[in-house]
Amino acid sequence: VTKQAGKLILTDDNFGTLVHAVDLGRDIYRRISSYVKLQLTILSSVLQLMLIATILNINEGVALFPMQLLFAKFFVVVTVVIGFIVDVPDPGVMERPPRAPGSRIATGAQTVRWIISGFIIAGSALALLAWGPGEPSTTDPSTSMTMAFTVVALSAVNMGFVMRRERQVPWSAPLFPYLGWIMLGWALTLAAVETRLLQRLLDTVSLTGA
């Protein structure tokens, strides 16, 4: 941000240009920080999900089918990432004090939060897989595995919503267009378990009884 601001000030000595450059840099940092935190939380949850399922021999270690993981990662999560990109700048970003030099996204406390959040998601999915309705299968669609997949996918979207603002509630105005992409993530998860095409592709079953 300092280098960018320096280049701008050489050609434009208006103080407002410098302020705008700092504002832009802080907003870019916020988006990158939210993206990194979301991805590492999801990675933590998936790794713990697979590891615990293998250790406890839940459904022979098959917590989710590969296509379910790929759909959650490359379709559902992408909607949240796009939401980060198109979200309006944080209106209060210039009211906060500057970050300390050398501050990092991946601090020790933040790593602990990623692990705990991932464990909660993984534990919820595994509980449904182990004790949910119907016996899970390593080859065929089942209600319990579909519920586990739904927990993972919805948790990814909801975590993205929570991580939208660093020091503000996630529903702080203006909500759109960010909320529109979050809603698309919810809709894709619903479609994955309720439309026949995606049911066949992802080996899911309807959770509404339809």
Predicted regions and their residues:
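Membrane-embedded transport module
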Residues: 3-168, 192
